[in-house]
Amino acid sequence: MHYRTDKPKVFVTDSGRFVADCQIILLGRKIICTGTDLQYEIAVAKAKSELAERIAFASPDAFNARVTRVARRLMLEATNAFNRESVTLPLSLFVTRPHLCWMRGNNSTGFAAHPRRKAAIEHAVNEVLERGWNARFRRDQQSLLKLATIRRDGSTAWVHESRLRQVSYCLANARVAGHVGWGSAVRRTTEAAVEAATSEAHAMSASGQDYGRGGTGVSELPSQHDQIAFVERQPVRIDDVTHYVIQAVSYS
């Protein structure tokens, strides 16, 4: 799949952060994605990676992995995110078509697209962890008060450091032109998690101001599963840059 974008729409927030919007027409529908960063080029690149992710999510399911039939069930060969061993899982865990999503159960899903395959894998796995913590703190909002609080550039971030996974989770909010947006992220370090979550919060507040839209609606549940597997979907090429698309799911 190869797509072209027009010149990105960019503005700068009061805190000096670039907010870039890129768009394409997919199946007759305008798809707009936002990227934010302190550097212009990175903000645009983030927007295009988000576009690649949305394109893969909205397109017919196509995997770079072997599909087999076991006892009348379609199974997909995935890779365990932690030990890199092959694992065979139900295909229904990975489909994104609405009429099949009910088969997913209580598994969280993570999508990521990036010009570097290794980075796409890491971001997809982190997103599964992120969505699990999102659901947990949404269910028990009082627990957020126990987390470390960081305030900077008009935004507030709450940080949870996971010793088990050796990663940091961050939930942040930010205000752009009177609109409040929320963002969350999981990264290897607290500083990286705060930056990623704050960046997403700025993107969501800007998106709400301009378009009043939300996210993709992928599953976000307080899963207790201790394993995560990933598969590679068909790559998406945007403006001559190939984006690897990785989908990760939790399983038991």
Swiss-Prot record:
One protein family per Pfam: YcaO
Matches recorded under InterPro entries: YcaO-like_dom (IPR003776)
Protein name per the record: Trifolitoxin operon protein TfxE
UniProt organism field: Rhizobium leguminosarum bv. trifolii
